[in-house]
Amino acid sequence: VKAELPDTDAVFGWVSPDCLPFAKRLRWLQSPQAGPTRGFYYDELVAHPVVVCNPRGVYNDHIAQHIMMYVLALSRGLPAYLEAQRHSRWERDAPSTRYVDLSQASALIVGVGGIGQETSLRCQAFGMTVHGIDERWEYETPGLQRHNAGELRGVAAEVDFVIATVPQTPATEGLFNRDVFTAMRSDAVSYTH
């Protein structure tokens, strides 16, 4: 890889810190993820003149559907039923987890960009009350109750589902800390994408 980098203008993926010094012509770095993972950004990359892009918007509906799959599965106790099925047990009673009527449930979406907006619309389609926290508020999302980042702990304490669709960046590191998780209700569900 290092031998190819001096003549490379664009990379799809990631350039490690030890390879970046060889990327003399690098002008474009395309991340394959909407929100790059921890370690993607490092000091030398941030200081480099390369333009870093991501496929923002491409996966909005797919990821929102994936999130709703978890919301539905967890609200109905599906993991407990699957565990009983795996052990060939017929459980007539409700599972040990709390049943959540989504039409009476609430969710907090942290990061209301494209994925968060799509998730909000799907939650609302099930009758859920949806709260959102975002720093930029780029999207109009009808029916969403807006909050600022300083309200994270308080709103997280009130909802049934806390859904994080915020990208993992240096600015969001530590956003979900012990205080937030301690404030959440014991029966609340946290999902991080």
Segment roles from a protein language model:
Residues V1-V52:
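An N-terminal-biased, well-structured beta-alpha scaffold segment characteristic
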Residues E4-L5, L20-A23, L102, R153-A157, ...:
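A short, aliphatic-rich alpha-helical micro-motif
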Residues H48-S106:
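Phosphate-binding beta-alpha-beta segment of Rossmann-like dinucleotide-binding domains, i.e.
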Residues H131:
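Conserved beta-strand positions in the Rossmann-like core of class I SAM-dependent methyltransferases
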Residues R136-H193:
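Rossmann-like adenosine-cofactor binding region
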